[in-house]
Amino acid sequence: MLKKQTAGLVLWGAIIFVGWNALLLLFFWTRPAPGRLPSDSALGDDPASLTREVIHLAEDAEAELERQRGLLQQIKEHYALWRQRWRVPTVAPPAWPRVPVTPSPVQIPILVIACDRSTVRRCLDKLLHYRPSAERFPIIVSQDCGHEETAQVIASYGTAVTHIRQPDLSNIAVQPDHRKFQGYYKIARHYRWALGQIFNKFKFPAAVVVEDDLEVAPDFFEYFQATYPLLRTDPSLWCVSAWNDNGKEQMVDSSKPELLYRTDFFPGLGWLLLADLWAELEPKWPKAFWDDWMRRPEQRKGRACIRPEISRTMTFGRKGVSHGQFFDQHLKFIKLNQQFVPFTQLDLSYLQQEAYDRDFLAQVYGAPQLQVEKVRTNDQKELGEVRVQYTSRDSFKAFAKALGVMDDLKSGVPRAGYRGIVTFQFRGRRVHLAPPQTWTGYDPSWN
């Protein structure tokens, strides 16, 4: 009898779904033809018209997918209600304790990666100016490239910093089509050697990695001192970063410098890691493009980083292997926090995975959904916090570009994203660019 009822319910669900799609197909066949798209020449004269058309098409696709999803969800809910009568009650697992974070006196070195920028002085001056303790935060400058002027600048700090030099300055044998990427190969070699010195030779339990073209915020050390215990105790975390990829002035809430997030995207640009992580990564360290390698699923393993609302580092180095394009287009606009936040006196337990997932997802999916064009034109300002939904790679990229956030993806993960959600400020209100609540994971083919 039970099998007959189950089969009947599934059959009726299938009939409803097929019938709905048949009606939908009939609707599309019989509705009046839409107006013609603008000609290529017209679009060329009016780029804004093309943007509106792309957004309109993406929103139409989103709306149709949402209707289909709603019908399937109704079928699932009715089936679940029926099955619930036959389900044996289960005991919920015990909740994790919410333990307030306390500051740790552990010694955390600042590893400065240097090469041929004599402007490393600007980086070191700020680090030394804001450093609360030379004993707790020793500064170790690892220099590659053999650039003598840079070496003299580092040496001028005497015992205030420790100067180590990467000994292998030879070119690296690469494939002919990768000769133009020689710089990226040398950077990966330098990182491997420098991190090996920190963890294998000096035996530090953790380190903050800083490039020589970064300027730090007044609470840079406070931030890492407070988040270190979280990183050490929460296995779902693998780094703490000082960087917000969408941290431009107009895209952050300047009134909340204390705000921190979890992110699935590895940000770099001033980041804390543990010795245990280096022991995991060192045997398979890549020959080049180490940061994108870190963002692959095989390395990330579902783990997250902590990142701030307002960046605690700012890059001033236009010169580099990327020839300045990314700096001119994006990096130079990132806001550096100037207000000291006493993070070690705050309860940061809300960043632990169980609490964060519960509260953050409730906040995002409790926010009213608004079409991207209405967000762009600042309609319904009274809503304050809103959600813009995407369901495909193309709709994410279209909506991200329309709202001014970074639209690139690494192994399916958006910059600053957590569970597919990118949170930012737009024209004074909080916006969450988010997938449906039924999101189950990243698609690595979204690149």
From Swiss-Prot:
Cysteines paired by S-S bonds: 115-145, 239-305
Residues where Mn(2+) binds: 213
Listed cofactors: Mn(2+)
Cytoplasmic side: 1-6
Localization of this protein: Golgi apparatus membrane; Cytoplasm, Perinuclear region
Gene3D superfamilies reported in the protein's UniProt record: N-Acetylglucosaminyltransferase I, Domain 2, Spore Coat Polysaccharide Biosynthesis Protein SpsA, Chain A
UniProt-annotated catalytic positions: 291 (proton acceptor)
UniProt keyword terms in alphabetical order: Cytoplasm, Disulfide bond, Glycosyltransferase, Golgi apparatus, Manganese, Membrane, Metal-binding, Signal-anchor, Transferase, Transmembrane, Transmembrane helix
Tissue specificity remark: Detected in kidney, liver and brain.
SUPFAM superfamilies: Nucleotide-diphospho-sugar transferases (SSF53448)
Cofactor remark: The cofactor is mostly bound to the substrate.
Entry EC number(s): 2.4.1.101
Pfam families: GNT-I
Pathway per the UniProt entry: Protein modification; protein glycosylation
GO process annotations (BP): in utero embryonic development; protein N-linked glycosylation via asparagine; UDP-N-acetylglucosamine catabolic process
Binding residues for substrate: 117, 144, 190, 212, 322
Any GO molecular function: alpha-1,3-mannosylglycoprotein 2-beta-N-acetylglucosaminyltransferase activity
UniProt function note: Initiates complex N-linked carbohydrate formation. Essential for the conversion of high-mannose to hybrid and complex N-glycans.
Family classification: Belongs to the glycosyltransferase 13 family.
Name this protein carries in UniProt: Alpha-1,3-mannosyl-glycoprotein 2-beta-N-acetylglucosaminyltransferase
Native source species: Mus musculus
